[in-house]
């Protein structure tokens, strides 16, 4: 759990959580500080990419404003009602100013396909 950016409008947290149990715990900690959490999950490990944890992830996505990185086409279809693929347009929407501070929680064990850098560059 590493805060990599913090301002009046946004906080960005990078966490190595890449298993549903760890992701749930990290969300819980983040929400203790701020209820307005956007979750970005990178499906980087073999078990995540193979879909072994898809059902558990759907349960997590149902309860959070969620985005996925590195999902297969099949997973994107499965997650469609609960999480959207992270794109440049999604990032623009995510970073829009609002009346309250937003926490962006990035859970994964890879590099988020460069999206983390794009988010940070957009905030700085």
What kind of region is each of these model predictions?
Residues 2-124:
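ATP-dependent carboxylate-amine ligase
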């Amino acid at each position: 759990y590493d805060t990599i950016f913090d301002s009046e409008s946004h906080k960005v947290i990078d966490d190595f959580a890449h298993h549903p149990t760890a992701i749930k715990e990290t969300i819980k900690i983040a929400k203790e500080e701020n209820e307005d959490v956007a979750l970005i999950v990178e499906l980087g490990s073999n078990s995540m990419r193979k879909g072994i944890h898809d059902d558990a992830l759907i349960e997590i996505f149902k309860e959070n404003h969620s985005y996925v990185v590195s999902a297969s086409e099949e997973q994107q279809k499965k997650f469609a009602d609960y999480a959207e693929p992270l794109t440049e347009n999604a990032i623009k929407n995510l970073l829009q100013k609002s009346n309250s501070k937003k926490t962006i929680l990035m859970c994964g064990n890879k590099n988020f396909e460069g999206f983390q850098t794009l988010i940070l560059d957009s905030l700085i």
